[in-house]
Structures are given as structure tokens and as C-alpha cells.
Amino acid sequence: MAVILAVEDDLFILQSLELVIEDLGHNALLASDLAGALLHLEAPGHIDGLFTDIRLFALGSGGYDVANQAIALRPDLPVLYTSGSVLSDEMIGRFVPGGRFLQKPYSSAQLESSLEELLR
């Protein structure tokens, strides 16, 4: 059983992420912004993967900030980004090394597959 930190500012999507993660047999840690993510990242305990929306509407932070802070605290943490924006070279250039991407909208099956791949 893995622990996945999901960061998403849309609470409906965040609740859906929790259900999918738990249906896969994993534990979900949830945050809607960088501050919430840092509470989990700075706490003791293992986190196996980070799933973050690139566009978070909290002032001054986004998924890139979440991922960069996560990697600073937990260098081996695999990261899966998501966004409704079309993936561009600029976006890819801001990914942490090894970062992956899942385009919104995605199906539950696509999310499940991407999360399982992230944890390999």
C-alpha cells in the first residue's frame, strides 16, 4: 500500500482523487495548496508519490512550487503533474527531473494507470 499526496484546488476533483487512490488500495493525503502540501511533506511519515495540478489558485504558488518544495524535502519522490492546459515545452522545462504529466480531463482509468506507473 502506497501513500500518495494529491494537491488540487478544485475540491470536487480532490475528493474524486481521494476515492480513486483509495480504490487502488493506497492511502491519500490531500491538500488544496502549497501550504497544505507542506504540512504533509514536512511531517514524519513516508510519501510514495505526488500528484499535483500545475495551476493552483492560491496566491503565489502552483504545482511547480509544490513539486520543487517536495523534491527539496524528499529528493526521491516521484511527481505526476496534471493540467487542463495543453502541454508545452515551457511547461515540460519546469518539471522536476523525472516528472510525468496527465492531461485533464482524464478518466478514472487513465488516472489509475498513471498513478500505478508513477509508483513503479
Predicted features along the sequence, with ranges:
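Two-component/phosphorelay signaling modules centered on CheY-like receiver
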Residues: L11-L30
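Conserved acidic carboxylate
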Residues: E8
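Conserved phosphotransfer cores of two-component systems
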Residues: E42-G45, Q69-L77, R94
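As written
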Residues: I92-L102
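Acidic, metal-coordinating helix/loop segments flanking the phosphotransfer/catalytic sites
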Residues: L30-G49, F57
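Conserved phosphotransfer microenvironments
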Residues: D53-N68
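C-terminal output helix
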Residues: Y106-L118
